[in-house]
Amino acid sequence: MESHRYEAMAKLADDTVLEAGAGLHRPRNVDWKRAAALLYGDWGTSKAYVIGLAFVAAGFSSLPIILAVCAVTGLVGVNYIVICRHFPDGGGVYSAARSQGRLLAVVGALLLVANLTVTAALSGWAALSYITSGAEHIAWIKLLRDHIALTTTVVLLFLGAINYFGPKHSGNLAIALAMPTVIVVLILIAVSVPHLTTKFLQPRHESLSALWVQFVGVILALSGAESIANLTGVMKLDPGSTPEHPSVARESLKAIAPVAVEVVLGTALLGWAMLSLPSVMGQTLHLTSPSAVSAALEARQQDMLRLIAEQFGTVTIAPWFGSVFSWIVGIVFFFLLLSASNTAIVAMIGLLYMMTRDGEMPRQFTRLNHHGVPSWPLLIAGGLPVAVVLIAADFNALVSLYAIGVVGAITVNVGSCSFNRTVEFTWYDRLLFAVTFLILGAVEITLARTKPDALFFIICVLGGGLALRAYTLKRHGLTTLTVTREVAAMVTPDLVSTMRPQLQEGQKIMVAARGPTPVLTYALEEAQLRKATLCVLYVREIAIFYGGGPPPPVRGRWQDNPEAAAIMSMMLKLGAERGISVLPVYAVSEDTSSTILDLAATMGVDYLILGASQRSAMAKLLRGSVATNVAQQLPDSIRLIIYG
């Protein structure tokens, strides 16, 4: 009986429930320059460790491998230019593959989760390698470097703790560092070019099959492609297109093309520069034998760009310049890699939450903390990279886990596009997708065959994720909703007349509620005194980064939110007792301040009542004050009252 009454109350309240963003389009405020900077913050970090790993794999015969990695990177970039042209609302693997089947989309998303997990761990480790190299003589830095796995764990836990407050302004560090990094890379190439030589290049020593395995082992420069595909949903539209018929073909092309060119050419030139280091290491480090040079290069595989800066800077200008420039490279890439690690954590939170909103993950994953961040996805996004770092034996063990996730996700994406008949791809687009699908499919199979640790890792991620999905689907439709006796007692046959808003000509007062605080009593007294309609607004803040795609649909029913239900039920009852017309207004939003402003203006209220901020100093620093933001932008026609 209680559940039937609750359903009746829910249906009757549908007319008075508002959703933030209903009938609106997500703001498209990311221009191509910002999108390119965000893409570079992910894609541009690959050169920091790809060339060093290539040398470890094949020594002075590694240039063909580096060039092959660059070629595949360029090929994937062309694929995603086409994908972004046809998916203006988000073309990541989860969105693109969903048209071919929900299970396929979930598999693609879980492969991306595996990639983001290793990206966070690997970027954190590499960041510490870049900042601590060359300072081993300092005792505490040597301690950090000797226990780099534990140090990386602490860094990842710190990033997870920061994300407890939400992802506001996430990615700003990557944007700020994009141009300095490009400048550093250009200077690095400039001091290296005079010393480039083919003298030390060697022919391959292995069979073609062994060369293929070596190539597969260092194909680490692909994960940025998914990030730009997810950004199309918030990119500015092309001139002449509309929100109803969006197009971001030109904007996405301008964002992808320069970054792809920089990544491809920069990685190729710096790889050649690495193989030309023996020409100067005899002068700077007095190393002449091939074995000594190879040992020195292998020892610096994790921070190869610093070694290139140090050696060529010393020979080209002066020893002091080589030392200073090496530290500049280390500091810039430290922050860029740290930002990439944080971005991976944020993206994983958003991806898990989006899957949950689509009914693919347990409902518990939607539970938010006080800052609007989903608790379980935050725990998973922060915990998985830590677990991987603690389990991995060394940097190379982390590298072995990396490619299988991102290559699998991109394979699912381009494969889905090649078979997608709902999108008007040209025949040569489909041919491009098919060729890329076959190449990356072969890479994925080779990774599974030659890297058992990577295969075990991806099976664990897929197995755990699909098990959670199976549990979720089994529970759908079987969970009953239980309400308290107090709520059930309020649902009577007279509820229709009780809840129907009795709007009259006159003033309207809106009060924004976050809990059963004294501001609600004050609002009731004001409404009774002025004989005004009282609009009780409850905003459920969701601090989620969706990776650029449109936010998933959210059921905006206050009856489904226990705290909102308690407040609204109490206010309806108290309003009825005092003869006040109470109008419940429920909104789900990423930005509480903007939602309050929009609804206050839309509903034409005369007074807006807010409670004094109860946030801590740290929360205000990271997220700002709602009352302050509202006061700065509220129209003059609406009077603001801050109570408390």
Question: Where does each model-flagged region fall?
Answer:
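Membrane-interface "cap" regions at the ends of multi-pass membrane proteins
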Residues: 1-50, 78, 95-97, 211-215
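Helix-loop-helix junctions that connect adjacent transmembrane segments
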Residues: 25, 175-230, 236, 272-276, ...
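Extracellular loop-to-transmembrane helix junctions
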Residues: 51-109, 118-155, 262-266
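Selective recognition of specific alpha-helical transmembrane segments in multi-pass small-molecule
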Residues: 68-75, 179-194, 249-281
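Loop-to-transmembrane helix boundary motifs in multi-pass membrane proteins
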Residues: 103, 145-153, 236-266, 353-390, ...
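C-terminal membrane-solvent junction of multi-pass transporters and transport-like membrane proteins
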Residues: 173, 205, 364-375, 410-452
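Extracellular/periplasmic helix-exit of transmembrane alpha-helices
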Residues: 240-245, 257-311
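Small/aliphatic-rich secondary-structure junction motif
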Residues: 501-561, 574-576, 583-585
